[in-house]
């Protein structure tokens, strides 16, 4: 009987810890944040609850974008730096990258881009060079989102142009 109670108690406490776990439980400032996030699964929680729970990390939700019916990108401020995370429909973090600083002069964007005058079929995220007043802006830093593998793929910015309409941050506005 004691063994049965011990096993039951062990299952209860293990399940309780699992239920409280989220994608930020392994994150530590000064450590490899993308590595700590990838493979974690987050429960559906209100953002303010997550931010309060992980206040020591300076956690702040910076916005999200639906990439496909099974994949979203979410920007988080963690330990004073911005990170972009790919999250699958079930809450699994499939990839994460440090996202570069952006501003009105170098705005963040997400969307379709062009190369050599032709539209590219993939979705790109990154930072643009906002110095020009043109509708298409050159890329400073970018990743292509591989929707099948749910991964960020770093791409060279040379020759890549993205529309001003893809700018999504208040610091870079239209």
Briefly describe each language-model feature range:
Residues 4-14:
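Sec-dependent N-terminal signal peptides
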Residues 20-174:
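Exposed acidic/polar residues on beta-strands and adjacent loops within beta-sheet cores, strongest
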